[in-house]
Design a protein with these regions (language model features):
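Hydrophobic residues within well-ordered alpha-helices
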Residues: 29, 85, 163-165
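Hydrophobic targeting segments
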Residues: 5, 13-17
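Short, well-formed alpha-helical segments that are part of the catalytic scaffolds
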Residues: 1-7
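Catalytic donor-sugar/metal-binding loop of nucleotide-sugar-dependent glycosyltransferases
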Residues: 126-127, 148-152, 161-179
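Hydrophobic/aromatic residues located in beta-strands of well-ordered beta-sheets
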Residues: 13-14, 64, 91, 160, ...
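A conserved acidic beta->alpha catalytic loop
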Residues: 18-26, 71
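Acceptor/aglycone-binding surface of glycosyltransferases and processive sugar-polymer synthases
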Residues: 35-58, 65, 74-154, 181-202, ...
């Protein structure tokens, strides 16, 4: 995966966030030429993302391209995310549901996706078809928006997109190719689906009265985070 990213985005700096994996992920990623940020134990998807964002902030990067490492996200699509950022978009969201045949998923996943797509679209004012997509490009403004003490530790999906919009950032979807997962397990499975639905719905319903997290500036959060 790392070499495919390097081939399709020459000159890009690759960071792998190893969320406490018990295997040789970190060593293999380094051998492939990536920088590795390793958690001492599994801290959750949201925390892994936040660690990567903080590292990008500390490094002074103006853009971040975010993708999963389970084979779903096609590195050939990275240039499309970059092109959308070039147009002035703050969050370029790769959607598997625009103009392509989406990979197979469970009925519960499809129903949940449509429901939260409807809610996110209503909040943002533009159609969002894939609110759970982790295939994204972020501008510097978007990076500063997610580096905060209130970033979700578990499932940062539709709620984060809505927060971006409320902060005046431009969110746009673009069609991307996604594949069947070749490794690992979906976060949206079993009892986790019920928890995800409950947590996400509650978060979105409370959005009108939720106060911004005031604690520390983005620079301070980035400097003091893993």
């Amino acid at each position: 995966m790392i070499r495919a990213v390097q081939e399709n985005a020459p000159g890009i700096d690759v960071l792998v966030v190893d969320d406490g994996s018990p295997d040789s992920t970190a060593a293999e990623a380094r051998a492939a030429g990536a920088r590795v940020l390793r958690h001492p134990f599994n801290m959750g998807y949201g925390t892994a993302l936040h660690s990567g964002y903080c590292a990008a902030m500390r490094g002074g990067y103006d853009r971040v391209l975010q993708m999963d490492a389970d084979g779903q996200h096609d590195p050939k699509m990275l240039r499309h995310l970059v092109a959308e950022l070039d147009r002035g978009t703050d969050i370029a969201l790769g959607s598997r549901y625009i103009g392509r045949q989406a990979p197979r998923s469970s009925l519960a996943r499809r129903v949940g996706t449509r429901f939260f797509s409807w809610i996110a679209s209503g909040w943002i004012g533009t159609r969002i078809t894939d609110p759970t997509s982790g295939f994204q490009g972020l501008s510097r403004r978007a990076l500063e928006s997610v580096v905060n003490d209130g970033f979700p530790e578990d499932y940062p999906d539709a709620d984060v997109l809505v927060q971006h919009h409320l902060r005046g950032l431009v969110v746009r979807e673009i069609p991307v190719l996604m594949h069947e997962r070749i490794g690992g397990l979906s976060m949206h499975r079993g009892a986790r689906i019920a928890y995800y639905g409950y947590k996400m719905l509650l978060t979105l319903l409370l959005m009108p009265i939720r106060r911004p997290t005031p604690l520390r500036s983005a620079d301070t959060v980035a400097r003091t985070s893993a």
